[in-house]
C-alpha cells in the first residue's frame, strides 16, 4: 500500500480543499510490473513544502480519476452503494431508469445540481483527462453506468435533489443541445405547468 507522499500525489497547499496538480505514476508502475496489487490512500496529497494535504469532499473519487489518468488507464470503475446513475433519485421516483451511458457534461451538471453519485471535481477531471468512469454497485452485480464523452439520448434527467424542509419542492435538470434556445425553455416550462407543476425558478 502507498500513501500520497510515497507516490507522490502533488497538490497545492489549500488544506481541506487541495487541488491535485501532478501525479507521478512511476512508483506505481514499478509495483504493478513486479506483479503486485497496489492499494493507494485516496483523499490526500502532498504540497511543495512536504506537508500532507486533504482534498475535501469527493476527494477519494478525484484521487481515483487522477491516478487512472496518470496511468493512462482505459477505464476507471468506482464501486458504490448504488447500481449506477439514474434518470432521477430512485428513493424519490420509484420509476427512475438507470442510464447505460451518460456524457461528462450531463454528469457534471447533475453533480453540480445535487446528485451525490460523483463529485463534480472528479467528473471535470475525468473529462479533461479522457478517462471513462463506470459507476456500479459492489453488492448487486449490476453493469452500472458509464460516464464518457457521448451519453445515450435523454433530455430530461429528472429530480436530482429534494430540499429537507419541504416535500413539495424539487430540482429538475433538463439537458440537451437544444436547451439554450428560449423557445425550448418555454416549451419545457409550459409542459410542467400543464402538469400542474408551479415553476419557482429557472
Model-predicted regions and their roles:
Residues 1-118, 122-123:
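Nucleotide/pyrophosphate-binding catalytic subdomain
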Residues 33, 71, 128-131, 165-169:
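Short gly/pro-enriched beta-turn/loop segments at secondary-structure junctions
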Residues 45, 60, 83, 140-141, ...:
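Short, glycine-/Ser/Thr-/acidic-enriched flexible segments
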Residues 60-63, 137, 198:
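Short linear Ser/Thr-Pro motifs
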Residues 75-79, 133-135, 200-201:
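Short hydrophobic alpha-helical runs that function as membrane-insertion/retention elements
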Residues 103-148, 154:
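A conserved active-site cap/scaffold subdomain adjacent to cofactor or substrate pockets
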Residues 144-202:
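A conserved regulatory-domain signal marking ACT and ACT-like small-molecule sensing domains
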Amino acid at each position: 500500500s502507498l500513501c500520497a507522499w510515497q507516490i507522490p500525489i502533488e497538490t497545492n497547499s489549500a488544506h481541506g480543499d487541495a487541488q491535485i496538480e501532478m501525479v507521478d505514476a512511476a512508483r506505481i508502475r514499478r509495483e504493478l510490473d513486479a506483479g503486485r496489487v497496489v492499494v493507494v490512500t485516496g483523499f490526500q496529497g502532498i504540497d511543495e513544502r512536504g506537508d500532507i494535504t486533504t482534498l475535501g469532499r469527493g476527494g477519494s473519487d478525484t484521487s481515483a480519476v487522477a491516478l487512472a489518468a496518470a496511468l493512462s488507464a482505459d477505464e476507471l470503475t468506482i464501486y458504490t452503494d448504488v447500481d449506477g446513475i439514474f434518470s432521477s433519485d430512485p428513493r424519490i421516483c420509484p420509476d427512475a431508469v438507470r442510464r447505460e451511458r451518460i456524457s461528462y457534461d450531463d454528469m457534471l451538471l447533475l453533480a453540480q445540481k445535487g446528485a451525490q453519485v460523483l463529485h463534480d471535481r472528479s467528473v471535470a477531471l475525468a473529462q479533461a483527462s479522457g478517462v471513462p468512469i463506470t459507476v456500479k454497485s459492489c453488492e448487486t452485480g449490476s453493469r452500472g453506468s458509464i460516464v464518457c464523452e457521448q451519453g445515450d439520448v435523454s433530455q430530461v434527467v429528472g429530480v436530482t435533489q429534494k430540499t429537507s424542509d419541504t416535500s413539495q419542492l424539487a430540482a429538475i435538470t433538463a439537458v440537451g443541445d437544444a436547451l439554450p434556445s428560449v423557445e425550448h425553455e418555454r416549451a419545457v416550462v409550459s409542459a410542467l405547468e400543464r402538469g400542474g407543476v408551479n415553476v419557482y425558478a429557472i
